[in-house]
């Protein structure tokens, strides 16, 4: 048994991502699984979290009450849905718990609530916790500065049939990285759908295309297309474990932070590159 530097609680323990997070927490050096949460009324309540995730007994029982486990964790990891995450955010803010938030689909009010909470607690909030995706975001900034003013920029993303928001949070983060490098606001230049007679492509826009099919874990491509050539920067995920490991790495990184809003690029130190 390794010595724990940080104790984590996992939201949505019975979901696809929740189970991966439990596996990662039980395997990662310096991390202790302190609590696992599911919604009230779930048939999984009372289960052993490790057995639920297929990695053996953990001694942590799946519960529905954050109040009941508030003394069992330091950082709360949440990859659920916006409404649930905001409820958890209020609890963590009240009790001084750090958060790692991988939930996507927040509206402006939800994002503002996260910003306000970060004045009191430490939060890592990222659209994607993969190391590769965050390296890609840095590459996109550099490509945009060189090619963005004369290229047609399109972002194509594909996910499994069960994903409920579109475009993905990662695709939006890609768009924001590109727009920011061009001194633009993504809200002013994004094109999210094309149908019927659209006319010619408007220069300076960033287009988005979405695929939902099968069990695709996550694929993202940014295209910089000019006459005669194009550059494509692509990331493909083959396992959710890459996201889970990134989230646990973020939780460890938060142990020295009292408050503030960070993203995965802060965790990886990419902003110094």
UniProtKB/Swiss-Prot annotation:
Pathway: Amino-acid biosynthesis; L-lysine biosynthesis via DAP pathway; (S)-tetrahydrodipicolinate from L-aspartate: step 4/4. One of its GO terms (molecular function) is oxidoreductase activity, acting on CH or CH2 groups, NAD or NADP as acceptor. GO terms for biological process: diaminopimelate biosynthetic process; lysine biosynthetic process via diaminopimelate. Its EC number is 1.17.1.8. The keyword Cell membrane does not apply. Pfam families: DapB_C, DapB_N. Gene3D superfamilies: Dihydrodipicolinate Reductase, domain 2, NAD(P)-binding Rossmann-like Domain. CDD domains: DHDPR_N. (S)-2,3,4,5-tetrahydrodipicolinate binds at residues 160, 169-170. It is found in: Cytoplasm. Keywords: Amino-acid biosynthesis, Cytoplasm, Diaminopimelate biosynthesis, Lysine biosynthesis, NAD, NADP, Oxidoreductase. Belongs to the DapB family. Catalyzes the conversion of 4-hydroxy-tetrahydrodipicolinate (HTPA) to tetrahydrodipicolinate. Homotetramer. This is 4-hydroxy-tetrahydrodipicolinate reductase.
């Amino acid at each position: 048994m390794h010595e724990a530097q940080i104790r984590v609680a996992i939201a949505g323990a019975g979901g696809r991502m929740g189970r991966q997070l439990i596996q990662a927490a039980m395997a990662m050096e310096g991390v202790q699984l302190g609590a696992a949460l599911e919604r009230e009324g779930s048939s999984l309540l009372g289960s052993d979290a490790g057995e639920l995730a297929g990695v053996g007994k953990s001694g942590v029982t799946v519960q529905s009450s954050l109040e009941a486990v508030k003394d069992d964790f330091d950082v709360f990891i949440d990859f659920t849905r916006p409404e649930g995450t905001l409820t958890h955010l209020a609890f963590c803010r009240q009790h001084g718990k750090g958060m790692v938030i991988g939930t996507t689909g927040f509206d402006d009010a939800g994002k503002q609530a996260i910003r306000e909470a970060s004045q009191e607690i430490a939060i890592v909030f990222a659209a994607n916790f993969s190391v590769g995706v965050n390296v890609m975001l840095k590459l996109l900034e550099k490509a945009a500065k060189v090619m963005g003013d004369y290229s047609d920029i399109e972002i194509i993303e594909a996910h499994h049939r069960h994903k409920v928001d579109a475009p993905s949070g990662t695709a939006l983060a890609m768009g924001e990285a590109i727009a920011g490098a061009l001194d633009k606001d993504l809200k002013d230049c994004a094109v999210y759908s094309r149908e019927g007679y659209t006319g010619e492509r408007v220069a300076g826009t960033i287009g988005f295309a979405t695929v939902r099919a099968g069990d695709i874990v996550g694929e993202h491509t940014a295209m910089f297309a000019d006459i005669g050539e194009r550059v494509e920067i692509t990331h493909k995920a083959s396992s959710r474990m890459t996201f889970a490991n990134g989230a646990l790495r973020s939780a460890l990184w938060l142990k020295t932070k009292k408050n503030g809003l960070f993203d995965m690029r802060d965790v990886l130190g990419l902003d110094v590159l």
